[in-house]
Amino acid sequence: MLLNQYTFSAERCTTPTSISHPPLACPTSPPPTNSLNRYQHKPVTLAPTVDHGCEINGTTIDCIPKDSKFYQLIMDLKQLLAGKGLSNEDIDVEKVKQLMADYDSNEIDWQHLALHDPSRNYSRNGIINLNGNANLLILVWSPGKSSAIHDHADAHCCVKMLAGELIEHLYDFPDHEGEELQCRQETSMKRNDVGYINDSIGLHKMSNPLQNRVSVSLHLYTPPYASMYGCSMYEASSGRKHHVDMSKYYSWQGQLVNEKESSTC
């Protein structure tokens, strides 16, 4: 499948530089805290499993050249998170962000992992399970499309722009159902920008403002609560909350897994 300058493989699996734009967390937001605890999740680690005959959530990766900087980023993240408990208080977010910022995006490194379903707003491609307490994904955003307004299930979310542009729309949690959600901040992210959000900052939605090309972003979620327990999306007109299962990837390590039923919010 040829999309703009990228060629994305869609084979079904049959075996088990400097940041010049503001970050996601705007300066006027409350300072991030590692103590979230909105959901009270049980401390169960993310384990490998099988989906449509393909092993997902594995902790190793062989489909990236070991001499690439992208592979080195993954290994650095894995080492940083090694030995950490499955608790949001254990994570050094600033070090995670710095590692992601140090990587200069190169399409050759990751384009075979960035599969895209043009019929959906965005496609979630699983890359690796980091020690059972974090997962790394590449999201491919269809032109002009966005996610729903959503939370992050008491997890930290670090985002690295790999290509294109995204706009973050930031919202406060509603005090009660029936309250219309008002966007309080919009932030643009372009190639190599790194951002961060957790539930103490608020809700957000992400949108691709480009009308003629996809945008691509790298996401690290730690702990990986959304994949394990799901998250919540919110109706903009009423603040009504809906639980969403986020366990189904569109692809895993470049192999198509869920062509028709992958999870998005």
Swiss-Prot record:
Fe cation binds at H150, H152, H204. Its cofactor is Fe cation. The thioether cross-link between Cys-157 and Tyr-221 plays a structural role through stabilizing the Fe(2+) ion, and prevents the production of highly damaging free hydroxyl radicals by holding the oxygen radical via hydroxyl hydrogen. InterPro entries: CDO_1, RmlC-like_jellyroll, RmlC_Cupin_sf. GO terms for biological process: L-cysteine catabolic process; L-cysteine catabolic process to pyruvate, using cysteine dioxygenase. One of its GO terms (molecular function) is ferrous iron binding. Its EC number is 1.13.11.20. Keywords: Dioxygenase, Iron, Metal-binding, Oxidoreductase, Thioether bond, Virulence. It comes from the Eukaryota. Signal peptide: none annotated. The keyword ATP-binding does not apply. There is a cross-link at C157-Y221 (3'-(S-cysteinyl)-tyrosine (Cys-Tyr)). It catalyses: L-cysteine + O2 = 3-sulfino-L-alanine + H(+). CDD domains: cupin_CDO. Residues 24-33 have a biased composition (Pro residues). Induction: Expression is under the control of the ZCF2 transcription factor and is regulated upon white-opaque switching. Transcription is also up-regulated in both intermediate and mature biofilms. Belongs to the cysteine dioxygenase family. PANTHER family: CYSTEINE DIOXYGENASE (PTHR12918), CYSTEINE DIOXYGENASE TYPE 1 (PTHR12918:SF1). This is Cysteine dioxygenase CDG1. The gene is CDG1.
